[in-house]
């Protein structure tokens, strides 16, 4: 079992929560990004620097994550790929992607992208806040507890 983080756009506070959970449960973490990341001081945490380009980090994660791994990503197409391969994906705002909800999330994402392109909608998601952090911490704890129990 490993935790993968789509690290380019992942908030620092989320990475720090994952690092603490990693130490507590002794689960390795791999950060994947197309820019250099500050190194966390733990033998359990590694970083992969991929080439700069559209979906390169996502492709790396999708190709290397195993079904027993957890992927932290806000990228809905990546989450859909992980779920389709039997894996577990969690959004930095605490939403667990499932077979039941990932298709709907993709459809909403695509619609919003079209509406933004047409100038009918402006802006993106709300600013990341305290409620999001709490929701993520709770979802991370529940998900990792379930995954660790299943592993044993």
From Swiss-Prot:
UniProt similarity note: Belongs to the UPF0178 family.
Protein name in UniProt: UPF0178 protein Gura_4014
Matches recorded under InterPro entries: UPF0178 (IPR003791)
A Pfam family per the record: DUF188
């Amino acid at each position: 079992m490993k935790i993968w983080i789509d690290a380019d756009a992942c908030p620092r506070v989320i990475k720090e929560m994952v690092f603490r959970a990693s130490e507590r449960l002794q689960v390795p973490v791999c950060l994947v990004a197309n820019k250099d990341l500050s190194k966390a001081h733990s033998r359990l945490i590694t970083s992969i620097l991929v080439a700069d380009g559209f979906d390169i980090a996502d492709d790396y994660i999708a190709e290397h994550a195993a079904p027993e791994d957890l992927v932290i990503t806000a990228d809905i197409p990546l989450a859909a790929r992980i779920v389709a391969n039997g894996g577990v994906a969690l959004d930095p705002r605490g939403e667990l992607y499932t077979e039941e909800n990932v298709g709907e999330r993709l459809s909403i994402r695509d619609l919003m992208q079209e509406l933004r392109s047409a100038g009918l909608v402006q802006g993106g998601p709300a600013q990341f806040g305290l409620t999001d952090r709490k929701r993520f911490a709770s979802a991370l704890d529940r998900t990792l507890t379930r995954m660790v129990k299943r592993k044993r």
